[in-house]
Amino acid sequence: MRPSGRALNEMRSVSIETGFTKHAEGSCLIKMGDTHVLCTATIEDRVPPFIKGSGLGWVTAEYGMLPRATNTRMRREAASGKQGGRTVEIQRLIGRALRAGVDRVALGERQITVDCDVLQADGGTRCASITGGWVALRLAVNKLMKAGDVTMDPLVDPVSAISCGIYAGQPVLDLDYPEDSEAGVDGNFIMTGSGKLIEVQMSAEGSVFSRDQMNELMDLAAKGTSELAEMQKAACA
């Protein structure tokens, strides 16, 4: 029995509110249960030096958590003068994931930065950031297309992410914090709307797992990301 009472293959309730901020070219507030993340996308007419003059675009991401996003206050990373290792890892993951769904030639030589700010955390913040980040990216690109700044849609496939794990001996979809903190196996799965894999992160937290168990988690992830892709499309319609 899951603490939330959800079925093993049931996600938390998900909502995506677009246009949450007025200044960013694309924005949304995504809620996956009690995990809430504000995602914004900013278009800039520049690219990193290593691709300047190549004609290729770039999508990157930044990630952060508000001090009271969790049950105890965290010190702002800006106050310490540097980002923590976890933050750097997650924002690189978000950037990699989103770029997998982008035709960088069609995007043209410009950069889109996706900022993901966790307002409240209850497990799965990186997955919510990727899923909401794609929505913000989609909305920003829509503005480029409407203005005629790009001639072809550079977004080739929706990108979303979901966590899966083994909790109390059972494979479960979309772990919240109580489950995540006690899971024997924990994994994050990033997939395209067409069902292709972008990245899989799995680790044995308390017990090792078999190939069959991994396949069960993969099936759950495919179900979850397919549902999220439909929600993304509906939010951007």
Swiss-Prot record:
GO molecular function, one term: tRNA nucleotidyltransferase activity
GO biological process: rRNA catabolic process; rRNA processing; tRNA processing
Keywords: Nucleotidyltransferase, RNA-binding, rRNA processing, Transferase, tRNA processing, tRNA-binding
Catalytic activity as recorded in UniProt: tRNA(n+1) + phosphate = tRNA(n) + a ribonucleoside 5'-diphosphate
Record keyword tRNA processing present: yes
TM annotation in the entry: none
Residue numbers binding phosphate: R86, G124, T125, R126
Cross-referenced Pfam families: RNase_PH, RNase_PH_C
EC number(s) per entry: 2.7.7.56
InterPro entries given in the database record: ExoRNase_PH_dom1 (IPR001247), ExoRNase_PH_dom2 (IPR015847), ExoRNase_PH_dom2_sf (IPR036345), PNPase/RNase_PH_dom_sf (IPR027408), Ribosomal_Su5_D2-typ_SF (IPR020568), RNase_PH (IPR050080), RNase_PH_bac-type (IPR002381), RNase_PH_CS (IPR018336)
Domain of life: Bacteria
NCBIfam families: RNasePH
UniProt-listed HAMAP family: RNase_PH (MF_00564)
Role summary: Phosphorolytic 3'-5' exoribonuclease that plays an important role in tRNA 3'-end maturation. Removes nucleotide residues following the 3'-CCA terminus of tRNAs; can also add nucleotides to the ends of RNA molecules by using nucleoside diphosphates as substrates, but this may not be physiologically important. Probably plays a role in initiation of 16S rRNA degradation (leading to ribosome degradation) during starvation.
Assembly behavior: Homohexameric ring arranged as a trimer of dimers.
Classification via PANTHER family: EXOSOME COMPLEX COMPONENT, EXOSOME COMPLEX COMPONENT RRP41
Family listed: Belongs to the RNase PH family.
Record-given protein name: Ribonuclease PH
Organism for this UniProt entry: Ruegeria sp. (strain TM1040)
Lineage of the organism: Bacteria, Pseudomonadati, Pseudomonadota, Alphaproteobacteria, Rhodobacterales
